[in-house]
């Protein structure tokens, strides 16, 4: 694990003992900190009896504490811990801030921080893959993979590649990334912020924490991202702010797991990061070709009778579905779920790529009303029915794509469960077996 002398003799409270919370407690204890822990569940907190004080931070005087460590899932705009800590003059932080404080005790290294509304995980994995191809020791962390504090420190010259959500940035005060990147920005998670401006300000803080001589990389696909790039230009030295033009990157047909305009943007961001890490073009080009995409993100799950089946269950809003529709010319589009938007305006430029649509879930009726004037629509309701109907209609050369433009919680536990169900249904139908069909309630 990552341990630092910076924690020695200090008092911390850790609220929530899930993965990042557990890693934080163990790192703090190993670093010599005095730790108070709490979780609403008895089992995880009982594991620290004898090594930590067991107490709810809301019930104690926090004066003199160095920080209250919470998970990114704690809504700071609603949870009482924020006001309680503020009254005691104590910062509310996350495990990424503890990592930032521990960096001085690590062997010389670099940190890449990647954020954005869509494409974070793919871009982060791609940067990690490129680093590995270049022979650089690298670790994944943040919003992907294992908690960063629970991983072994890298040797000298290593690169920590962090996917950072806005929630994690909110809990971070001193992470000066050697290379920081903002892929894109569109409305999301607005229940946690004072409107879109608050959400954008959260993303912008990643660059405010940098030094003037550290690299800031930006996509060019939306005005909100470009505005943050302009702000960074005022605080960074000349030549350290890079606005990426995906159209300048050629060879996408050679990268099977990076199809579609959104993946061209993800690749362009990753390539610019690689350049700033000093990785040669022949290495990153080879890595783009060998990259295997993440599950549920434009995942090619099967091909049968000339029809390709693509699982893009991670597309939980119209902005992330739109570029998926741009990836193929003839798509049977399965969409719907728990809506984040009552329109599909961002998808409209790619409607001519859609042969037919199949609507499911709570958003199904509304989306059907939007689409019926411009394309054939089947009101399928259930995913298993939609896949079966799309498979029956598809011709050789067509693509059957689940790209829901919605959250999953009306019918599935999460987007992973939805994508897994799609894969299982496709495999069953190809093998001429009865397709599994959930009852329409999340499990």
UniProtKB/Swiss-Prot annotation:
The keyword Glycosyltransferase does not apply. Its main location: cytoplasm. It is found in: Cytoplasm. Pathway: Cell wall biogenesis; peptidoglycan biosynthesis. It catalyses: UDP-N-acetyl-alpha-D-muramoyl-L-alanine + D-glutamate + ATP = UDP-N-acetyl-alpha-D-muramoyl-L-alanyl-D-glutamate + ADP + phosphate + H(+). GO terms for cellular component: cytoplasm. Keywords: ATP-binding, Cell cycle, Cell division, Cell shape, Cell wall biogenesis/degradation, Cytoplasm, Ligase, Nucleotide-binding, Peptidoglycan synthesis. GO terms for molecular function: ATP binding; UDP-N-acetylmuramoylalanine-D-glutamate ligase activity. ATP binds at residues 116-122. Its EC number is 6.3.2.9. Transmembrane segments: none annotated. GO terms for biological process: cell division; cell wall organization; peptidoglycan biosynthetic process; regulation of cell shape. It is an enzyme of class 6 (ligase). It comes from the Bacteria. Cell wall formation. Catalyzes the addition of glutamate to the nucleotide precursor UDP-N-acetylmuramoyl-L-alanine (UMA). Belongs to the MurCDEF family. This is UDP-N-acetylmuramoylalanine--D-glutamate ligase. It comes from Novosphingobium aromaticivorans (strain ATCC 700278 / DSM 12444 / CCUG 56034 / CIP 105152 / NBRC 16084 / F199).
